[in-house]
Amino acid sequence: VRPAGGHISSPFGFRINPFTHSYAFHAGTDLAANCNSPIFAAHGGTVLYAGPNGGYGNFVLIDNGNGMSTGYGHIVNGGVHVRVGQPVGPGQPIAAVGSTGHSTGCHLHYEVRQNGNAIDAVPFMRNNGIELAN
């Protein structure tokens, strides 16, 4: 399931960090969605974390099984709709888009990790029949 609406505003990989102005690795894919629009669990699993998380702002982390996890960052204050330990299904609303943490505007920072290592969400989702690219 596509985790949010909007176009890709910042892809996975190296980029100029808008806060430090240095070349740095961006471990997720940013979707420029409207403020307060819904964020959906892209895959089913169990919520591992739900709350503030530094530069990610308000953040939800879901264990999707088989070493895979998905992260959802910059959630609006008061917009986390799940709790740690809660099972979630694909497409379930879990949060609302915001601009908390190191963010320059409303968007979802969507991160996919395999065995703890960040992977590019665009080909991963495409292989699962979901298009993130514009």
Range-by-range predicted roles:
Residues 2-134:
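Catalytic cores of peptidoglycan-degrading enzymes
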